[in-house]
Design a protein with these regions (language model features):
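Glycine-rich phosphate/adenosyl-contacting loop at the front of the ribokinase-like
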Residues: 1-46, 51-62
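Ribokinase/PfkB-type carbohydrate-kinase core domain
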Residues: 46, 57-72, 84-168
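Residues at secondary-structure transition points
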Residues: 14, 18-25, 29, 51, ...
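Residues embedded in well-ordered beta-strands
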Residues: 20, 42, 81-83, 93-94
Length: 168
């Protein structure tokens, strides 16, 4: 995340004042918040084998989060977001690179099905490939697990899947 006195116009370079790097993403932030609130959270994501993955894994370890079901890609980098914030207006511009999360396969998703046995909630979002979200929502619905979906960043998702979501 970078702060700057004003956001650049197309083709403009502006000098920033602050730069911070850390873990994040909608799913990660939601999982951490639920964990800190006392929920029994198993983090499910797909990471590359890079320094961004190390940051995420180290943070999960420091927080005492379950990370034994994290998936890995040897071919694709960990997803990241480039965030610029205008210091005066607090307006931001964000570019999300889905990275490894966008490569979750149906087989990988199916391998996580047992996590929903006895689960009360599935908390998910769209910073991943939509087909994996649709598949896990369908599985959760069949198992009677309540589904919470953060619909950002906006991507097309079927009405059939949305009808299975308990909270958007």
């Amino acid at each position: 995340m970078g702060r700057t006195p004003h956001l650049p116009a197309p083709g403009e370079t502006v000098k920033g004042t602050v730069f911070k790097m850390g873990p994040g993403g909608k799913g990660f932030n939601q999982g951490v918040a639920a964990h800190k609130a006392g929920a029994d959270v198993t983090m499910v994501t797909k990471l590359g084998r890079d320094s961004f993955a190390d940051i995420a894994l180290n943070t999960m370890t420091e927080l005492g989060m379950k990370k034994d079901r994290v998936l890995y890609s040897d071919d694709t980098e960990t997803g990241c977001a480039l965030i610029m914030v205008d210091e005066n207006s607090s307006q931001n511009e964000i570019v999300v690179i889905l990275g490894a999360c966008n490569t979750i396969t149906d087989a990988e998703g199916d391998s996580l099905e047992d996590l929903l046995d006895g689960a009360e909630y599935l908390l998910t979002q769209l910073e991943t490939n939509v087909s994996s979200v649709e598949r896990i929502v369908d599985i959760a619905c069949k198992k009677g697990v309540k589904v919470i979906l953060n619909t950002a960043p906006v991507q097309p998702i079927s009405d059939e899947v949305l009808s299975k979501v308990d909270l958007i």
